[in-house]
């Protein structure tokens, strides 16, 4: 079987890291010439099945419509109450999996800690006061570890901590993945850094505001969930 993933440029480093054997084409949908190249490729290759998981955009719907068979994710019939990630498994016709949470026992020492306080949903951002408390706690518990804060919002940065400015570019994504690799403990409030950290088998603290269901983690993950 042959697969092709189409994605924005900032997502290609993630595909290359975790699905290195899969063909991936990154493009800017606001660039007409790049869109025409993808359009020409899809007409020539004639794929059998098209999916656009988690996407409701017209561009992704347009591209998968070139396949012999396709179903827009926005039109997928799903139960009114279902796990966010289980929806995609059903959409892609993947087998059901049991959901297991194994509590993580934190190590006695961490030298490098990465904190990602920002979420795509601003209501789920890590509050400033809690961020300050976390930094103080880590400094006491782990004898002044090297703490890095990664965010697009400069107000999240703190004196005494390294700062990493997240940007929507491929280079920034590559640097962010490398930063997670070099960190021993990851703290986040969003599923993006969460899944990257788990895929790289990093110790993780996830602070999640109310969602339904409350815990949405991959099977077999090791972490502590704190609901704000």
Identify the residue ranges that each predicted region occupies.
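Catalytic machinery of carbohydrate-active enzymes
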Residues: 1-228
């Amino acid at each position: 079987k042959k697969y092709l993933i189409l994605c924005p440029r900032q997502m290609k480093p993630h595909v290359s890291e975790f699905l290195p054997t899969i063909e991936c084409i990154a493009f800017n949908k606001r660039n007409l010439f790049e869109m025409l190249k993808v359009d020409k490729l899809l007409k020539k290759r004639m794929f059998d099945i098209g999916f656009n998981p988690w996407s409701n955009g017209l561009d992704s719907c347009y591209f998968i419509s070139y396949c012999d068979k396709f179903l827009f994710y926005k039109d997928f019939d799903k139960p009114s109450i279902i796990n966010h990630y289980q929806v995609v498994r059903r959409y892609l016709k993947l087998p059901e999996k049991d959901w297991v949470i194994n509590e993580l026992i934190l190590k006695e020492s961490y030298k490098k800690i990465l904190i990602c306080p920002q979420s795509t949903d601003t209501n789920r951002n890590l509050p400033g006061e809690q961020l300050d408390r976390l930094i103080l706690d880590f400094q006491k518990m782990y004898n002044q570890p090297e703490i890095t804060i990664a965010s697009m919002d400069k107000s999240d940065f703190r004196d005494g901590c390294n700062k990493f400015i997240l940007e929507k570019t491929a280079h920034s994504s590559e640097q962010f993945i490398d930063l997670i690799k070099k960190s021993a403990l990851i703290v986040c409030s969003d599923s993006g850094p969460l899944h990257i950290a788990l895929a790289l088998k990093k110790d993780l603290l996830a602070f999640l505001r109310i969602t339904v269901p409350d815990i949405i983690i991959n099977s077999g993950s090791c972490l502590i969930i704190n609901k704000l």
